Regions:
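Ferredoxin-type iron-sulfur electron-transfer modules and their immediate structural context
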Residues: 1-119
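Iron-sulfur-cluster electron-transfer modules
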Residues: 90-259, 264-273, 411-421
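Ribonuclease/tRNase effector modules and their secretory precursors
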Residues: 400, 404-477
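Extended, hydrophobic interaction surfaces within ordered domains
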Residues: 1-34, 63, 112-148, 240, ...
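Conserved beta-strand elements of the Class I
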Residues: 187-188, 299, 370
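Short coil/turn segments at secondary-structure boundaries
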Residues: 78-86, 155-159, 474
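Cofactor-cradling patches in redox/metallo enzymes
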Residues: 193-279, 305-321, 328-418
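Iron-sulfur (Fe-S) cluster-binding segments and ferredoxin-like electron-carrier domains
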Residues: 38-55, 81-100, 128-146, 230-235, ...
Length: 477
């Protein structure tokens, strides 16, 4: 064949080169002929073709062109096919990893790879799709930690998310045993996004667990620390871990019932406690009385936090089937499921990239989406797609309109207030204002896009009312 001829010519050329140098023609030849390769090439959908016969004098020009066309240009882009992050930057992981590493070594000057390293959702999909298991998420996560520890990473890309985590673990934080118990066998940890987006679901779920689970079920409202870990802020994560360990000790170190797969993963790795998903508990004790499935086929979006967790993936599908849902698995589901755009704080560091990630998720099916991560449900609903968190189906509640960033904080406080009042007969005195602020729809939309809280605006106005000092903009009067 022509390849054999080309190999023979190269082999002969190497022999001549060695002889000219007065070296043995048998030395320093390296690997010759066919050798194993680590390069993976997906040949699915590629049809074989007949080799063009080669005459004794070689190919004619036209024959050579036709034979060359049979080459499929072997390359591996399995991770780039499904990962928006890699496909948008149009760089293979090896090259991107090198550039990110070089970025961490810059002492003075522009760190131009900060945005790319902060745009990865840290979901781990690339590791599953890569035939060699290359983990781009670990590269980006380690780089963030390195940049933070050496004071090279600006706070700006993740500041709002980190402040929101601190709010969840301070003003909106709550840790209580079930009434009638000093310590509990279990504690429900719904996660900060559930309380912000669907507070009624959290309340109904907790009341149901208290009524049907033996041994007492405590409650912790707060953040698991995934936010600071994604941001590479190791010290903040350690403070969250210590806070949660202390609160769990007060409850008698109970088994944690997590309402979020990311929380479940984070708490398992950092608290030393036994952690189970609420879906596992409900499978054991039976569906709540208000559980209702959708009458139409539904598409499941598997959460990043459940990647590699076959038990959780199966349990979710079993619960949906038990509710009468017709479950549809999409092309990229289970361990291959893409990130919704919230993971890794992509939604804060690179909104355009996050929007494309959400779009990538939604293009897999036209059916309503069922999630078991509240952040996924929030992002899909914001794009106008009908979606439900599985707990909304299980407890007959629907978050309806997706709250903006200010409403999410307010929802957490209201949830805490209602739980204290209805479950523990305690009053929480929320701050009362003697005035109201009217916002136009455009203002609310712009504030949400720019991550400006209503409370920030009200603090500015309160300061003005006290000091009577302000800057007047002639153009917007």
């Amino acid at each position: 064949s022509v390849m054999d001829a080309a190999f023979a010519a190269k082999r002969a050329a190497l022999t001549v080169d060695l002889l000219v140098q007065n070296l043995s023609p048998h030395s320093n030849r390296g690997s010759e002929g066919a050798v194993p390769t680590k390069l993976y090439t997906n040949t699915e959908g590629i049809r074989g073709s007949e080799r063009i016969p080669c005459g004794a004098d070689g190919y004619l020009k036209e024959e050579a062109v036709e034979e060359a066309k049979r080459c499929i240009q072997c390359h591996c882009d399995e991770c780039m096919k499904s990962c928006v992050y890699l496909s948008e930057y149009k760089k293979y992981p090896g090259l991107l990893a090198r550039e990110i590493y070089n970025n961490t070594q810059i002492i003075m000057g522009d760190h131009q790879m900060n945005k790319p390293m902060n745009s990865c959702s840290l979901c781990g999909q690339c590791t599953v799709t890569c035939p060699n298991g290359f983990d781009m998420s670990q590269v980006c996560k380690s780089a963030r930690e390195n940049m933070v520890s050496t004071d090279k990473m600006p706070l700006a890309p993740h500041e709002f998310a980190l402040m929101d985590m601190l709010f969840s673990n301070s003003d909106a934080f709550l840790c209580k045993p079930q009434p009638g118990y000093e310590t509990c066998r279990y504690v429900f940890f719904p996660g900060c996004q559930a309380g912000a987006i669907a507070p009624d679901v959290v309340m109904d779920a907790y009341e149901d667990l208290c009524a049907r689970v033996e041994g007492g079920v405590g409650l912790i409202l707060g953040c698991c620390g995934a936010i600071s870990e994604w941001a590479g802020r190791y010290e903040m994560t350690e403070k969250v871990n210590e806070q949660l360990k202390q609160e769990l000790a007060k409850l008698g170190d109970p088994v944690i019932i997590a309402g979020c797969p990311s929380c479940m993963k984070q708490l398992k790795e950092n608290t030393g406690a036994e952690v189970r998903g609420i879906w596992e508990i409900l499978k054991e004790i039976g569906l709540p009385g208000k559980a209702r499935g959708l009458e139409m086929p539904v598409a499941i979006h598997d959460a990043c936090g459940a990647r590699g967790d076959t038990r959780t993936q199966d349990t979710i599908r079993e619960l949906l089937t038990a509710m009468g849902c017709t479950v549809e698995d999409t092309e990229y589901s289970r361990d291959l499921s893409p990130c919704c755009g919230y993971g890794g704080l992509t939604a804060y560091a690179n909104k355009e990239m996050a929007a494309k990630m959400t779009e990538k998720c939604l293009e897999r099916s036209d059916a309503p989406y069922i999630t078991y991560c509240m952040a996924c449900r929030d992002r899909f609903a914001r794009e106008g797609r009908e979606s439900r968190h599985i707990l909304e189906l299980l407890y007959g509640d629907n978050a309806c309109n997706m709250p903006d960033i200010s409403e999410k904080r307010y929802n957490r406080l209201v949830l805490k207030e209602k739980l204290l009042k209805n479950i523990w007969n305690e009053e929480l005195m929320m701050e009362k204002k003697d005035y109201t602020v009217a916002y136009t729809e455009d203002a609310i939309r712009m504030m949400d896009e720019r991550m400006i809280l209503k409370s920030d605006v009200e603090h500015v106005l309160a300061d003005y009312r006290e000091s009577q000092e302000a800057v007047f903009d002639e153009e917007t009067k």
